[in-house]
Amino acid sequence: MRMRALGLMAAALGGLIPLVLILGGCGDKGAAQQKQATEITKGIEDYLALIEVPGQPLRLRHDKVTVTPSEDGKSYLVAITGLRYGTETAAMAAFGEVDYRLTPEGDDQYQVGDLKMPNEVSVAGKDGKPEATVKFETTAFSAIWSKPLQNFLKFDWQVKDIVASAADQPGELFKIATASVTGDGKESGKGLLDQISKLTLSGFTATDPQDGTSFKLDTLIGNVSFEKLDFPAYRQMMAKINTFSTKYAQPTDGSAGGGATPDAPKLTEEDSKALADLVRGFPKLMSAYGYDFSAEGLTMTNARGDVLMHLTHGGLALGVKGIDTDHAEAHFGIQHDGLTVNGPMFEDPLARATLPTSGNLDLVMTDLPVPSLVESVAQAIPELTSADPQVAQGAQFMLMGGLMSALSQSTIKLRIDPSALETEKARLTADGELKLAMQTPQKAVGAVNFALVGLDDLMALATGLANENPEAAQAVQMMQMLQSLSQRETGGDGKPVDKFKLDLTEAGQVLVNGKSLEEIAP
């Protein structure tokens, strides 16, 4: 449990920086190129030590870093050999050697170019047996590295013809026509970094070898951004986490006798306090973080080529700002458009009429009590990372209690920005605002407004099917209840609109248009 928690912390922090950071270089400009090369080598080794997480048995590894002054007298040739992912004795993914050129640009930056790396990566299982091969071709690479920040300010990696093949079966697991990873950042002063990283994939295809089901995706775009990332503090925190991971790693040498695995070292009181302080410091690393993904043209077909599902567009977004303040704000959004599903289930007219072909949900949560929530985690983290299962389980209850206490004293609000679901026969919209109220039965108070267009059409369809379809009969009863609760108006297009105001009261009542659900519900 301890190592899982430490590993998750390292992964969460490490996920802020693209894996391509291994390609960077550092070092201050010296009078002699050889001295500069030595400094660059040390900088690369130091950074690799951070992202390789030495305390984890399964991790990124390398053999050696070599930096050589080039013949032009200005740039440096860098070679990282033995790059791989796996255990100390077995590589699950072998990347081989990565070479590139560093060219000083002013006093604080390097241009990174002339990337050379294998165009084939072998993937193996934990037993070392080959499982798959991934082939690709790099078409372009460029980057600008900041020496003060020890990170990329800009990078652009373009790849094409990505093909993955299994070792034990013919054919291809998946193909990607083109892919790119780009980043655009700027230093906002005092070691703070603002950056947006973007991943773009196009022409993705894959086939399930078991049943022949095929997947096709025209485009996938993902963005990850952060603001005012304190890079010096980030490096220090990563170094401390790596120290903890190494110091309290689970032994694997069987020294406990009888081939048993010995217990991990017990966390000292001093290290328990240090680990808790690490958690408390996490919100100060940055002011905002967010990501979003969007997909275009997702199609699934069976072995005969029949379209089982198609989605024209889908998207997901999550962002948090004010992380370094007492009251943060979070946004969550999800949307889709052009959804069609074929199959026996959707031969039923009612199922087809109620399939949400498009929709969106936009939520904004304000007044998140960052300090009190983080303090709850900090107090529980030493026990959560305990190797004793009973202690770790007790810490989970302690954490839940601390979080509930923090929430009960907060003023969190949830705002539902205009959201909607649309089907073949109807359209439902919603908006409103709720406030957290842990003392009430529903744990919230406030109001949400709903508007439904097409209730009459759905009722007519369900009524016509009710005699032969039990589910349609149940739907009729539900829609009759909705009609009894509705406040009907006429929309701008002349169609009837059934409106519902859902109120959660301080007294614990649930009201719909002023009527109590307890009195109406059967």
Describe each PLM feature range.
Residues 22-25:
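C-terminal motif of bacterial Sec signal peptides marking the signal peptidase cleavage site
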Residues 1-14:
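Bacterial N-terminal signal peptides that target proteins for export
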Residues 27-522:
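Glycine-rich, small/hydroxylated-residue low-complexity segments
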